[in-house]
Amino acid sequence: MSESHSLGKNGERLAIKYLRQNGYKVLEKNWITGRKEIDIIAEDDEFIIFIEVKTRMADFQLHPRDTVSVHKQRNIIFAAQTYIQRNEIEKEARFDIITVVVEGAKHELEHIKDAFYPTL
């Protein structure tokens, strides 16, 4: 496993731990439809939440949230629509980003709710 892949998987583990500690129910990890993937699908009482996790080292020049391109957002939205249809979900959808910035043995996690909208 490459170092960046390992870093990303660690970020996803931290994100899932955070979500569970904050009352979210994690439904899926790395859910794939065709060539599109959603890192985490979770829910709370009100929303079905599609979450992109971005993990970077502290010395990376861009903040992780700035690396989620419009193209990536469209792919997540398309995959989310497929998931909602296949599973007959009736809750309102929300699209979040969780960023994890790693510096040595420490990390900083940020949960950005409503990070983007399906009107793209």
Q: Where do the protein language model's features map onto the residues?
A:
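Short acidic/glycine-enriched loop/turn segments that link adjacent beta-strands
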Residues: 33-36, 105
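Domain-level recognition of nuclease-like catalytic cores that cleave nucleotide substrates
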Residues: 86-120
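Acidic-basic catalytic patches of nuclease active cores, encompassing PD-(D/E)XK
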Residues: 1-29
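Secondary-structure boundary/capping motif
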Residues: 24-25, 29-30, 49, 110-115
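Conserved catalytic cores of phosphodiester-cleaving nucleases, focusing on short active-site segments
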Residues: 19, 38-60, 76
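Short, glycine/acidic-enriched loop or turn micro-motifs at the edges of active sites
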Residues: 31-33, 55, 99
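Mg2+/Mn2+-dependent nuclease catalytic core
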Residues: 57-77, 82
